[in-house]
Amino acid sequence: NNAGAAGPKYTLRDIPFTDVEMRAAETDQTMFDSAMNLLGAPWNMARAAAAHLSDGGTIVNVSTIFSRTHYYGRIPYVVPKSGLNALGKGLALELGEKQGIRVNTLFPGPIESERIDTVFARMDELQNIAPGSTSQEFRDLMITTRTGEDGLEYRYPTPTDVANGIVWLASEESAAVSGHHVEVTNGMQVPAQSRSQLVSWP
């Protein structure tokens, strides 16, 4: 259960909310479009699949570690993904009790690719910080070193790493796992709760 979106484009004040604003910005999505893509699609897919899954079936949602940390210029991406995290918990409770269906959510980190380099470079531009700063910040959060073909020790997880996590969550080997968030991040040290939550709670 997965949906994606393009790289960073706008800070909060510039995100188009109406079709008029979207056309003026010469882009192809409003905030509503992004939310329907990233949250609405998995919601409807889960609802359709649940009617056909037997006892022991499983649903794997693909979120992102960035739903739990800052991802500058990507509000239309991370907000619906945060909603997907809550949806996964709710589905696990409801479908597990009524139908014996397991639901888990996978949290990939940055994926080793040219695309993530481009995304992070754009974030550097939006924040007016030194080139490479965003990439280095996230590499510094990882506790596992894995040398890639380029010799870099702190490389990001690969698409294969993410696929392996999904296969495991969908298999009988994870039969006792449901309602959980599983990270594929090379051990990125990202807190489960945001600072804003901790400040707002009594």
Positions of the model-derived regions?
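Catalytic Tyr-X3-Lys loop
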Residues: 16-43, 60, 84, 153
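Active-site loop-to-helix junction immediately N-terminal to the catalytic Tyr of the SDR YXXXK motif
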Residues: 70-79, 90
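Conserved mid-core segment of classical short-chain dehydrogenase/reductases
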Residues: 4-30, 34, 73-76, 117, ...
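Active-site helix of classical SDR
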Residues: 46, 80, 88
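Short, small/polar-rich loop/turn modules that mediate ligand/substrate recognition or access, typified
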Residues: 97-102, 177-179
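Amphipathic alpha-helical dimer-interface segment in Rossmann-like NAD(P)H-dependent oxidoreductases
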Residues: 4, 29, 33-57, 92-97, ...
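Short C-terminal tail/terminal secondary-structure segment
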Residues: 9, 154, 165-168, 178-202
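A glycine/serine/threonine-rich, flexible loop-to-helix segment
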Residues: 13-19, 98, 111-150, 193-202
